[in-house]
């Protein structure tokens, strides 16, 4: 685990691809791309099944290990919302519903038309950018704030 001091905030970069903010008991991550494998398979691209389950299990484990109370997804919660099936939504709802955290999302470029899916899964949707504890949270890294944490480039922290 790598400790990062960013402005007046202190984070831990975790091996599970999350950024942990212990003072607020918040996990930040980006680019889950739920449904990516199924979308590729629907398009005739042979990719193995189960990737999203692994990603959600990794997130669940991170929540349990840190005792997080809040999770922020910094964009691309979904890969291609028009191809999301009822079966996928049922599976994701079952995986996420047992986690006792507040879920927040800033919708990314892959999340067009994702609003109803995100709210069904219990996510609070926030605009891009959103100011959180003096740090701009965004999906795209091109906003002009001094301190920002962004996804999109899987992921990045930019120091100015």
Segments predicted by a language model, with ranges:
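Zn-dependent metallo-beta-lactamase
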Residues: 1-25
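Core catalytic region of metal-dependent phosphoesterases/phosphodiesterases
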Residues: 27-29, 36-131
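Short, solvent-exposed loop/turn motifs
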Residues: 10, 25-27, 131, 136
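Conserved beta-sheet core of the metallophosphoesterase superfamily
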Residues: 124-160
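Short loop/edge segments at beta-strand edges and connector loops
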Residues: 15, 107, 139
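Conserved beta-strand elements of the Class I
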Residues: 20, 27-29, 136, 147
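Catalytic metal-binding/acid-base residues of hydrolase active sites
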Residues: 33, 78, 110-111, 142-143, ...
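Acidic, His/Gly-rich catalytic cores of divalent-metal-dependent hydrolytic chemistry
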Residues: 5, 34-38, 157-160
């Amino acid at each position: 685990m790598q400790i990062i001091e960013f402005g007046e905030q202190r984070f831990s970069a975790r091996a599970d691809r999350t950024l942990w903010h212990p003072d607020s008991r918040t996990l930040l991550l980006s680019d889950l791309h739920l449904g990516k494998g199924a979308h590729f398979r629907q398009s005739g691209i042979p990719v193995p099944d189960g990737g999203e389950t692994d990603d959600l299990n990794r997130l669940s484990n991170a929540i349990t290990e840190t005792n997080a109370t809040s999770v922020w997804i910094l964009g691309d919660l979904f890969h291609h919302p028009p191809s999301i099936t009822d079966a996928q939504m049922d599976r994701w709802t079952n995986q996420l519903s047992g986690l006792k955290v507040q879920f927040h999302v800033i919708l990314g470029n892959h999340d067009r038309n994702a609003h109803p899916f995100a709210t069904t899964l219990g996510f609070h949707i926030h605009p891009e950018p959103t100011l959180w504890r003096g740090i701009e949270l965004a999906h795209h890294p091109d906003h002009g704030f001094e301190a920002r944490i962004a996804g999109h480039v899987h992921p990045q922290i930019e120091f100015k």
